[in-house]
């Protein structure tokens, strides 16, 4: 049975049961995507892993959760009964992510929190329930895979060159490694 067939069969299930099933799936996929309030694991895990591993994780793994939410919302739960809740969760994810990023002094933690914020933008597009919102979410997810992976790879270069990922000790990077500083700036 594929997702489209499951979606057709879902119409036979009472609305309350459908909402409960979608809620449980959203919690599971929300953990993977790191949406608020299920994002606490991400900022602590990415800074501790090697930069190459973090680049792959940041670029791909959180987007698996976003992809699962997109597939579930568009193929199985097409009525959009939880779109308003999803929108509020997305807004909270954006806010928590960016406020967390502002408070960081480590570049990997800063990028981890901004990643959470960006996931909020993707989920917001899904929550709109329109073709434009969905297209924007998909485009942004693909774009974010490339950009976030590149950023964490450059952070790996910065750590290798400077010996630290602390923002307080990277002020002279433009003088000691101008090419790496420019790569990160771009």
Per-range role (PLM):
Residues 1-186:
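Hydrophobic transmembrane alpha-helices and their helix-loop junctions in integral membrane proteins
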């Amino acid at each position: 049975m594929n997702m489209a067939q499951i979606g057709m069969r879902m119409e036979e299930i009472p609305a309350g049961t459908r909402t409960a099933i979608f809620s449980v799936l959203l919690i599971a996929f929300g953990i993977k995507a790191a949406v608020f309030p299920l994002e606490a694991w991400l900022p602590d895990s990415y800074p501790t892993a090697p930069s190459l591993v973090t680049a792959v994780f940041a670029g791909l793994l959180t987007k698996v959760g976003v992809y699962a939410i997109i597939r579930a919302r568009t193929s199985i739960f097409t009525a959009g009964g939880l779109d308003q809740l999803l929108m509020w969760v997305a807004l909270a994810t954006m806010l928590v992510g960016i406020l967390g990023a502002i408070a960081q002094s480590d570049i990997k933690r800063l990028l981890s929190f901004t990643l959470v914020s960006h996931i909020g933008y993707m989920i917001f597009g899904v929550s709109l329930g329109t073709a434009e919102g969905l297209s924007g979410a998909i485009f942004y997810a693909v774009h974010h895979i490339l950009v976030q992976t590149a950023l964490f790879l450059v952070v790996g270069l910065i750590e290798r060159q400077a010996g630290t990922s602390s923002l307080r000790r990277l002020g002279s990077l433009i003088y000691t490694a101008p090419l790496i500083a420019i790569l990160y700036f771009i």
